[in-house]
Amino acid sequence: ADLIGAVRNDRLLLDEASIPLPLDGRHNARNLLLALAVGSHLGVDPASAAQLQVNIPGGRNRRLQQGGLTLLDETYNASPEAVLAALDLLADQPGRRFAVLGTMLELGDRSIELHQQVAARAAALKLDGVVLVDGGDEGHAMANVASGLDRLALVATPEAAAAPLGQWLKAGDVVLLKASRGVALERLIPLLPSV
């Protein structure tokens, strides 16, 4: 069954229904529309299906308010596509926008290239600041690509990211935290400044 929808603010608009989006981001709105189309094809009313509860574990598409900051907590895992989608979500936020990007692990021979693509997107979005958490080749490659940003820091650990952020952040800022699970970027959250 064909299902056509449009996104307005935090709602998915269908012919017969206005459905609240359970997750942030255009990529998640597309996913919801696809799921509703499959359900509709199987005979499930889209408005009824949209009433289901969405339970997302910590570190996945979680919006937190902490100390005057809005945190987009994506610390659980990262792939190139997921990081690009998260950066686009950050770019859609009002106010000053900062990204803390850790290594994407297990990418094989294309790891450097894929990290450079992510850094290029961060630079193109003209974010207000980026902290890269990686002491290896990937971090240095990302820093070289994003070197035109006014605020850019390369640190070795999540805890070390608190220092540059402490100098940059002000009340009302939005901070994206995104990395592979092995980076344990969630360790940074309690260290972020209250502004």
Regions found by a protein language model. Give the residues of each.
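Conserved phosphate-donor
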Residues: 1-3
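A short, compositionally biased
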Residues: 5-11
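ATP-dependent carboxylate-amine ligase
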Residues: 8, 17-195
